[in-house]
């Protein structure tokens, strides 16, 4: 599981305090510690002691499918993160990357144990007018200019998913599909500006499901059972009602993914009751997602069959590398990188090491930059190995994401604009060379910015005939 974070910036004075004598010491004794230098301290390239070279990469497409979307793992309880939003929707017309289908599981609880409806006294009558499941809308990604509506269905979850275990993007809910609880159709082209009226008050855009009457009857029965019912305590309630499963209808042919803050899910019960003084009154009770007891997780399924990307992804990597690379926000496709030239590279001080990747846009005359929300605004880089163990390159924790870069940038050459992603990984390359690490791999993919599955980029691969292939540029000083 990978989650992107901005790390603390290193104190700049500790870098600029590096003196020439320290550099010379490392040159004479070998280099196994951090030797990243600011630009004004990088030695002049004299081709006697200090050189610069550009090295070819070997790049392949791989699947990155291990995003933690619910529960807890290694102390990180993602279900309790207030800024981790869940994807909901379908993309069915992406000819390059294929189809995406996103759904989620969410649980709610009464505000208190031994919940009771607001009645003046025992024996007064009560009528539930409606129960609404409300989930705030945050944003959307995809082709929001497409005027195609999407329908979402609500079902009852029939399996317990513990908040103390881990759920991933590939975790699928178990639901009672024979009994539809609610259905709602939305158009993401206008949804972001829709402000529903609740009474006389305008609300922020939200997904609102009016739940079936059979759910109202069932809930009311459990409450009226008192100590013997599900509303007596939180454990009983979650045993009785394990959660809601919200998913796109099978008939959807959308082109947009919506993002919802189901951390703020509300179940609102609107009802009337008779007062002891006569007449009726109206009121409401609210059940909510409670991070101390409830769980939530996001299921995101990618289907590449029939897409262009499917031609570049397989169980066996192309030994010559792929000519095109596909990078999605996790879960999805990522690019694996090997650098053959580093094998048996002479021991040196690496003064600068920078990877460069160039985007292809549009791809195959298909306007991916317009139709699907633009290229990844930022890619992230990880160090992995032959076993698939992923770690962020240490430059993130030492210097911060701004130093590593990976941001989308544009430059012009001969009147043509190009989009590139660059990564500064000097210390990582230094250790690979110093330790003669023959198992290392690097991996680039979209950053996880709280919007799982968003954004995509098509990049030139190492086997491309174009001269804008990915490359490693190094400035290094040989150790005599």
Per-range role (PLM):
Residues 2-480:
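Secreted, disulfide-rich extracellular signaling modules
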């Amino acid at each position: 599981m990978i989650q992107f974070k901005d790390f603390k910036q290193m104190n700049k004075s500790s870098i600029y305090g590096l003196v020439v004598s320290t550099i010379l010491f490392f040159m004479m004794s070998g280099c196994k510690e951090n030797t990243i230098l600011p630009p004004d301290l990088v030695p002049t390239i004299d081709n006697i002691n200090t050189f610069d070279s550009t090295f070819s990469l070997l790049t392949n497409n791989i699947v990155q499918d291990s995003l933690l979307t619910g529960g807890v793992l290694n102390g990180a309880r993602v279900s309790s993160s207030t800024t981790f939003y869940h994807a909901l929707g379908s993309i069915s017309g992406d000819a390059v990357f294929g189809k995406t289908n996103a759904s989620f599981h969410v649980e709610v609880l009464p505000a208190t144990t031994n919940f009771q409806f607001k009645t003046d006294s025992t024996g007064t009558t009560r009528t539930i007018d409606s129960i609404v499941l409300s989930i705030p809308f945050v944003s959307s990604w995809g082709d929001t200019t497409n005027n195609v509506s999407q329908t979402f269905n609500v079902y009852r979850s029939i399996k317990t998913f513990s908040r103390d275990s881990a759920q991933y993007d590939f975790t699928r809910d178990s639901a009672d599909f024979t009994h539809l609880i609610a259905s709602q159709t939305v158009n993401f082209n206008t949804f972001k500006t829709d402000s529903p009226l609740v009474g006389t008050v305008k609300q922020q855009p939200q997904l609102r499901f009016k739940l079936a009457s059979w759910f109202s009857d069932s809930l009311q029965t459990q409450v009226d059972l008192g100590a013997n019912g599900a509303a007596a305590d939180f454990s009983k309630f979650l045993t009785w009602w394990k959660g809601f499963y919200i998913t796109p209808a099978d008939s959807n042919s959308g082109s947009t993914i919506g993002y919802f803050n189901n951390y703020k899910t509300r179940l609102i019960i609107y009802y009337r009751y008779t007062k002891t003084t006569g007449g009726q009154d109206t009121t409401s009770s609210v059940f909510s997602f409670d991070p101390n007891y409830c769980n939530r997780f996001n299921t995101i399924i990618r289907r590449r069959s029939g897409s262009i990307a499917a031609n570049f992804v397989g169980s066996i990597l192309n030994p010559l590398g792929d000519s095109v690379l596909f990078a999605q926000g996790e879960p999805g496709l990522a690019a694996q990188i090997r650098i053959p030239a580093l094998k048996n590279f002479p021991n040196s001080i690496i003064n600068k090491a920078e990877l460069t990747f160039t985007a292809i846009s549009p791809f195959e005359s298909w306007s991916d930059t317009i139709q699907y929300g633009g290229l990844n605004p930022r890619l992230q880089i990880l160090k992995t190995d032959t076993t698939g163990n992923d770690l962020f390159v240490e430059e993130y924790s030492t210097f911060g994401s701004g130093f590593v870069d990976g941001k989308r940038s544009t430059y012009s050459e001969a009147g043509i604009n190009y989009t590139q992603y660059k990564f500064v990984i000097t210390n990582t390359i230094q250790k690979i060379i110093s330790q003669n690490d023959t198992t290392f791999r690097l991996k680039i993919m979209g950053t996880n910015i709280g919007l799982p599955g968003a954004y995509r980029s098509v990049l030139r691969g190492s086997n491309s005939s174009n001269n804008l292939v990915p490359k490693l540029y190094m400035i290094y000083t040989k150790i005599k």
